[in-house]
C-alpha cells in the first residue's frame, strides 16, 4: 500500500462528520494504546496567604445522558442536529440512541448552559462537567 501524504490524510478527515471523527479518535487510541486526554500538572500545595483559591473551570463538556421521557426522542434528535452543526439525521439518531455521548467539548460556561437549557427543553438528560 502506498503511503498517504499529510495533505491526503487531512482531506480524508475534512470530509467526515463530528461523530465519525469521534469514532476515528477512539479507534486510533485503541490501535496505538494512547489517549487524547491532556495530562494534568499536579497542583502545588501550601502556598502563602496570597495564594489564589482553586482556579475556576473555564472549559466544559456537555454530555447527553439519555432521554427524560421516551416520547421526546424525535425532539431530542432535532435539537442534537441544532447543537452539532453538520450532523446528519442518522448520526444524530445514533448519538441519541447510544447515550451517554459527548455533545460538545471545551465550551464556555455560558454556551454549556445554553446547550443544556435547549436540550433539556427538548426532553434530554444533560450533564455538564
From Swiss-Prot:
As for what it does, the entry says:
Forms part of the ribosomal stalk which helps the ribosome interact with GTP-bound translation factors. Is thus essential for accurate translation.
The cysteines joined by S-S bonds are: none
Query: Which family does this protein fall into?
Result: Belongs to the bacterial ribosomal protein bL12 family.
- GO-annotated molecular function: mRNA binding; structural constituent of ribosome
Please name the CDD domains in this protein's record.
Answer: Ribosomal_L7_L12 (cd00387)
Q: Looking at the record's lineage, which domain of life comes first?
A: Bacteria
Could you list this entry's UniProt keywords, alphabetically sorted. Ribonucleoprotein, Ribosomal protein
Q: Which GO terms describe its cellular component?
A: cytosolic large ribosomal subunit
Source organism of the structure? Treponema pallidum (strain Nichols)
What is the protein's given name?
Answer: Large ribosomal subunit protein bL12
Pfam families assigned? Ribosomal_L12, Ribosomal_L12_N
Q: How does it assemble?
A: Homodimer. Part of the ribosomal stalk of the 50S ribosomal subunit. Forms a multimeric L10(L12)X complex, where L10 forms an elongated spine to which 2 to 4 L12 dimers bind in a sequential fashion. Binds GTP-bound translation factors.
Q: For this chain's UniProt record, which GO biological process terms are given? A: translation
Amino acid at each position: 500500500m502506498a503511503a498517504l501524504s499529510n495533505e491526503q490524510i487531512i482531506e480524508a478527515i475534512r470530509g467526515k462528520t463530528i461523530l465519525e471523527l469521534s469514532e476515528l479518535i477512539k479507534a486510533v487510541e485503541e490501535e496505538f494504546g494512547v489517549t487524547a486526554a491532556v495530562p494534568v500538572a499536579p497542583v502545588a500545595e501550601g502556598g502563602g496567604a496570597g495564594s489564589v483559591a482553586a482556579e475556576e473551570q473555564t472549559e466544559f463538556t456537555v454530555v447527553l445522558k439519555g432521554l427524560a421521557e421516551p416520547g421526546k426522542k424525535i425532539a431530542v434528535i432535532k435539537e442534537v442536529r441544532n447543537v452539532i452543526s453538520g450532523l446528519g439525521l442518522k448520526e444524530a439518531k445514533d448519538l441519541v440512541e447510544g447515550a451517554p455521548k459527548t455533545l460538545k467539548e471545551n465550551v464556555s460556561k455560558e454556551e454549556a448552559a445554553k446547550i443544556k437549557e435547549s436540550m433539556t427543553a427538548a426532553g434530554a438528560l444533560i450533564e455538564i462537567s
